[in-house]
């Protein structure tokens, strides 16, 4: 929607400069004729008039500017490089920089600055364009009405593209006031002067249509701003105005679909998208927007939120295909390799959304469980969005998932006999059980190549996590993030992690600072701390996998020191710290971390009151989209988390040869969960304890049954002589050949 403005902007530039510098009557006449020829599309005649003006006044740089604009429009806006070069030369000629604008004397150069801002906008240099636009806005009073509106619309577009919705809303209020005042002034003039003039009435009708179009555009911008702020109540009111002014046009239906997506009405959002008539859209060559690409992308976002990840990736691939087809058509028009911005309309410089779509695909593939494919998408996206710490975290998550190496049963937490018995060697009396090694740490992930090479290895994950930490601001406080859900932008939605969908829903009207994280939403204060917690947790895990125990302990300690920490990450922080301490032979410190009382909550997020969007239900979508991953990554309850702590605590006691305490921890944990949920590591721990106690036959029985035996007793329990003694009668079932147990 933003890129349909270049033609209007160019015409305004020409009008404002063409009539402002006339001195003689001849120059005024030539200037008027040039402007009329320009507005009617007769660029050859316009250039002839400008050439005559140039002969009369060779020192006026504004004539050169108008000539450059006219030639640009004559080429159907395909000579962006030439226009850009001319503007730079003119800026050097007048020795003026936008930073030096400090008074009304410099206002006459405003057209030059505005043209530069338009080009910067189309080259995606938004920060520089905003700098120029804001300087122009300071001196907007003397500008003629049409040019002032063009400056404001450009700034609004830039604010929305850079997620500064509050600034955009303020400027839109100014625009509304400006348009209504201008309309009242025109009505007054028409009543006094042109009541009987047929041309005057036609002009009035045309200006009325332009005003209605401007109002419709303002309403659409307001909806986009409210969508960014997740202010669903305000958005609901404004959507009605959009539908009244724009009808069932594709942009209005896309906006309403995005609104329903945020409310969680996914089926309605899909229905609205399907009802849009894409065929009526002018096409990307005129607007710079590939509506088909946006359509498939937004469908992918919606299906991601519905946890239909395979359908989501299907739609994202369709969007990528559409985008590639459009880019192929655009590149066919470029003939001069030295002028990469020429050979196609300037508005199409914003058409390519490949990297945003790759980002979406990567997040979706990560949820499907295809980390290597996700890595390939995200590693390409990070070359463009290298300043996004959240993207570096996602890359690290791809590396971790690709190197996890767990079977489906282990992922579900079920004991597998493969995880206990590796093989049986020998025959007869000499047969032996070879227990599987549970040590997956310190694996050599690197096969000799540099860890800086982008491969889905744990070494590269460590680099990604370092980058992510370095990109976070030093002084920031307050968490809120985690999984990778997505956020669709009304006409070209980018998917992203659920932290942005969820936490941006908090009203941040207090102007809290945020850092950009393109192509997704910016990271605000709450999200930044939560992102930091996730990065520290992943860093500790990766350091343990690489055998860097001191670094792992450092990351785990930093994680536990965070002021707002989710229960799940606090649980992981204690586990990682304990594992690092055990590897450093600091068992006593590790036991402190393994206290089950440390676990009081295993929720993925932090309880907060930030969901203040009233009765609208839009925020549910972030949790719905991430719900399927949670059970795989975290214990499902506090009870199961405490059993994990007890199993690990038992292992720590074994290392200190406190076998009675270890046995007590083991069976306390086993009593808290279903026998089938006991992990293979706990069964091996029970085998080890029985061997240390001299109960070889009981150890063999545990291995054969592949579960902890309920009647395992300590010496103090044996004296009680209970009626229930199932272990001894079962012993004859054992194969007598299993006499020796050894660890490979």
From Swiss-Prot:
GO cellular component, one term: nucleus
Entry function: Component of the CCR4-NOT complex which is one of the major cellular mRNA deadenylases and is linked to various cellular processes including bulk mRNA degradation, miRNA-mediated repression, translational repression during translational initiation and general transcription regulation. Additional complex functions may be a consequence of its influence on mRNA expression. Is not required for association of CNOT7 to the CCR4-NOT complex.
Major localization class: cytoplasm
SMART domains in UniProt: TPR (SM00028)
Regions annotated as coiled coil: 74-107
Low complexity bias: start-end ranges: 183-199, 496-506
Superkingdom of the source species: Eukaryota
Residues recorded with modification N-acetylalanine: 2
Assigned keywords, A-Z: Acetylation, Coiled coil, Cytoplasm, Nucleus, RNA-mediated gene silencing, Transcription, Transcription regulation, Translation regulation
The species this protein was found in: Macaca fascicularis
Protein name: CCR4-NOT transcription complex subunit 10
Residues covered by region (Disordered): 1-25, 183-204, 477-521, 602-634
Residue stretches of biased makeup (Polar residues): 484-495, 602-612
Subcellular location: Cytoplasm; Nucleus
Compositionally biased spans, kind Basic and acidic residues: 1-16
Family the UniProt entry places it in: Belongs to the CNOT10 family.
Subunit-structure text: Component of the CCR4-NOT complex; distinct complexes seem to exist that differ in the participation of probably mutually exclusive catalytic subunits. CNOT10 and CNOT11 form a subcomplex docked to the CNOT1 scaffold.
Any one biological process term the GO annotation gives: negative regulation of translation
């Amino acid at each position: 929607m933003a890129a349909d403005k270049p033609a209007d902007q160019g015409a305004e530039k020409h009008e404002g400069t063409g009539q402002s510098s006339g001195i003689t009557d001849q120059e005024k006449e030539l200037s008027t004729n040039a402007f009329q020829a320009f507005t009617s599309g007769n660029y050859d005649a316009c250039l002839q008039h400008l050439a005559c003006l140039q002969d009369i006044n060779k020192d006026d740089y504004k004539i050169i500017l108008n000539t450059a604009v006219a030639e640009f429009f004559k080429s159907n806006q395909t000579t962006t490089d030439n226009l850009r070069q001319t503007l730079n030369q003119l800026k050097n000629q007048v020795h003026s920089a936008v930073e030096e604008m400090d008074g009304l004397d410099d206002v006459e150069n405003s057209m030059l600055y505005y043209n530069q801002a338009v080009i910067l906008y189309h080259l995606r240099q938004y920060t520089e364009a905003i700098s120029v636009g804001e300087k122009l806005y300071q001196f907007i009073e003397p500008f003629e009405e049409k040019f002032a509106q063009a400056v404001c619309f450009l700034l609004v577009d830039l604010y929305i593209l850079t997620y500064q919705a509050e600034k955009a809303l303020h400027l839109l209020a100014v625009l509304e006031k400006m348009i209504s005042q201008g309309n009242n002034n025109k009505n007054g003039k028409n009543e006094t002067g042109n009541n009987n003039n047929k041309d005057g009435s036609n002009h009035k009708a045309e200006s009325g249509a332009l005003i209605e179009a401007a109002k419709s555009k303002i309403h659409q911008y307001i909806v986009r701003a409210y969508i960014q702020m997740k202010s669903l109540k305000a958005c609901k009111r404004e959507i009605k105005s959009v539908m009244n002014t724009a009808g069932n046009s594709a942009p209005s239906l896309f906006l309403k679909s995005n609104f329903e997506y945020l409310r969680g009405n996914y089926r309605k959002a899909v229905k609205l998208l399907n009802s849009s008539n894409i065929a009526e859209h002018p096409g990307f060559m005129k607007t710079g927007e590939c509506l088909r690409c946006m359509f498939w992308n937004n469908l992918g976002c919606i299906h991601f939120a519905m946890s239909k990840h395979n359908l989501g990736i299907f739609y994202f691939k369709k969007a990528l295909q559409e985008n590639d087809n459009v880019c192929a058509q655009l590149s066919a028009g470029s003939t001069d390799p030295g002028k990469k911005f020429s050979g196609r309309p300037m508005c199409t410089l914003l058409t390519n959304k490949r990297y945003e779509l790759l980002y979406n695909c990567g997040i979706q593939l990560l949820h499907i469980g295809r980390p290597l494919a996700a890595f390939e998408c995200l590693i390409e996206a990070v070359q463009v969005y290298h300043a996004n710490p959240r993207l570096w975290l996602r890359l690290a998550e791809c590396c971790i998932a690709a190197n996890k190496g767990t079977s489906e049963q282990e992922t579900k937490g079920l004991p597998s006999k493969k995880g206990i018995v590796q093989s049986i060697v020998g025959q007869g009396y000499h047969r032996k059980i070879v227990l599987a090694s549970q040590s997956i740490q310190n694996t050599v992930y690197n096969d000799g190549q540099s860890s800086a090479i982008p491969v889905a290895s744990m070494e590269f994950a460590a680099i990604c996590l370092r980058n992510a930490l370095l990109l976070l601001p030093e002084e920031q406080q307050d968490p809120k993030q985690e999984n990778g859900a997505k956020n669709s932008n009304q006409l070209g939605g980018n998917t992203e992690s659920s932290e942005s969908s969820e936490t941006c829903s908090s009203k941040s009207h207090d102007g809290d600072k945020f850092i950009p994280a393109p192509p997704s939403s910016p990271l605000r204060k709450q999200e930044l701390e939560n992102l930091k917690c996730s990065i520290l947790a992943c860093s500790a895990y990766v350091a343990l996998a690489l055998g860097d125990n001191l670094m792992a302990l450092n990351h785990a300690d930093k994680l536990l020191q965070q002021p707002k920490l989710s229960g799940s990450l606090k649980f992981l922080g204690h586990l990682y710290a304990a594992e690092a301490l055990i590897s450093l032979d600091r068992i006593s410190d590790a036991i402190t971390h393994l206290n089950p009382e440390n676990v009081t909550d295993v929720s993925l997020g932090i309880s907060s009151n930030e969901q203040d969007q009233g009765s609208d239900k839009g925020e549910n979508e972030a949790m719905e989209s991430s719900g399927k991953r949670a059970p795989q990554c975290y214990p499902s309850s506090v009870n199961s988390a405490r059993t994990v702590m007890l199993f690990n605590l038992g292992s720590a006691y074994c290392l200190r040869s406190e076998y009675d305490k270890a046995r007590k921890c083991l069976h306390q944990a086993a009593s808290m969960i279903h026998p089938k949920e006991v992990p293979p590591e706990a069964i091996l721990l029970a085998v080890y304890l029985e061997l240390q106690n001299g109960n070889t036959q009981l150890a063999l029985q545990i291995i054969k049954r592949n579960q902890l035996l309920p009647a395992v007793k300590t010496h103090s329990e044996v004296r009680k002589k209970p009626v229930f003694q199932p272990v001894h009668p079962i012993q004859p079932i054992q194969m007598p050949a299993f006499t020796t147990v050894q660890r490979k």
